[in-house]
Amino acid sequence: MARDTVRAKSKPQARSNGRQASARGGFWRFVRQLIAVVVILALVVPPVSVVVYRFVPPPITILMITRLIQGHGMDYQWRSLRDMSPSLPAAAVASEDSLFCSNHGFDFDAIEKAMKNNERRPNRIRGGSTISQQTAKNVFLWPGRDYVRKAIEAWYTVLIEAIWGKPRIMEMYLNVVEFGPGVYGAEAASQRFFHKPAARLTAAESARLIAVLPKPLKWDVDEPGRYVVRRTGHIDRAMGTVRNDGLADCVRR
């Protein structure tokens, strides 16, 4: 009789343990499936989006949405590279990435220097991003400096270098980069600050637009401070070297 009672009690307990084990197994199956989905999306979505934007302009970016939420508005006017002054890509190369035409999306010397500088002076973060890296960030990603975003940025950089090529990268860069609060792209900036289309910008005007790019919410194209004025002059002079040495020739179509 006692044995029968023990067996009767052990059966519900065994069923309970079985259900718990099944639940744990189901949870881990879900986790594995979720990881698989994330990996597949990470491998598929970036190439597809890069291919699409090889042919069409992005309607909006994450940064634009962020600024809209912050109340900055959005002035975004797409123009082809042919409809911009040639001084614009020259100024961008002079200021942001002198090896743009010869690198493959990454300037490892600049990255190493930036890392050493940031170790010595953590309160003054210095970037080592190329124009291609900045374009990948501006078009596809969110603002920030975390390592996850930088890793995704590197993957997008490889893709746009392979699929877009230098002319399209420069065209995209000059169309989506932020020149002021809610002002995106060279055409919107040219109309806002100089009351003319981007095709008619002078070298000095292009240099001033590019000069504010590191801190477009802090530095003003309309009322440039002394540092922006000095930076504009430096870029303007460096553009001569860019032209003479053909450092921006790869963007010609």
Indicate where each model-derived feature is located.
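Juxtamembrane regions of bacterial inner-membrane/periplasmic proteins
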Residues: 2-253
